[in-house]
Amino acid sequence: MLDFFSKKGNEDSEEIVLIEDKMPKHIAIIMDGNGRWAKKRGLPRTMGHRAGVKTIKTIVKECDKLGVKYLTLYAFSTENWKRPEDEVNALMKLVVEFIKNEIDELHQNGVRVQTIGDLSRFPEEPKKAILWAMEKTKDNTGVVLSLALNYGGRNEIVRGIKSVIEDVKAGKISIDDINEDMFNDYLYTKGMPDPDLIIRPSGEQRLSNFLLWQCAYSEFWYSQINWPDFNGEDLRKAIFDYQNRDRRFGGIK
């Protein structure tokens, strides 16, 4: 067992005991609340995003310490292009800054960086930085940090279906070969386990087009805390709640 004396945000402290054998293999987080965090402090939204980037480092370290193998972060959705141009440009710059400032430490700690989503629309500078980080860390065996960039769950499924159809037409597979396991190989998350736990801070309770195929049996945990204020204690509380649920996967116990 892993024993922590912790507290949730500003609430009363409480003891959290985590069980190593019940640790989620894959945690996915919808990093929400940057704008609210900034507005509350009278700051521009871009400052909220910058504060949120610092939280990423904290949570990656915590996952490594706890033995969580896969961490997927919803960083930029296919719908985020609709935001004001200056905000989108600021987000692209933050991607580059994050990689330049953090990649050496991530690499030294064995973190493998990868992405899910379509990078083709990304500007050249952030795209090069991302690909460089992936190449630099490709042989690492620690936490697998997947950044969801220009990602949308519906888009991913449609893309996968199109690829399946193309392979059927080309004679590479037959219709009888198609099943859930095979279709998984046509998704961005190929080779990864489905998320055991999906966390969304900020008080919102929706999926926002995130991992729609993969979340069929995921457990969800919502928090009123905005992402820039989310910390290791909050992560442990989410895991504690997850470990005390009865996961039946559609069956009966």
UniProtKB/Swiss-Prot annotation:
Keyword Transferase tagged: yes
Coiled coil stretches, renumbered: none
GO terms under cellular component: cytosol
Keywords for the protein's UniProt record, in alphabetical order: Magnesium, Metal-binding, Transferase
Catalytic residue positions: 32, 80 (proton acceptor)
Membrane found in the keyword field: no
Record note on quaternary structure: Homodimer.
Name listed for the protein in its UniProt record: Isoprenyl transferase
Protein source organism: Clostridium perfringens (strain 13 / Type A)
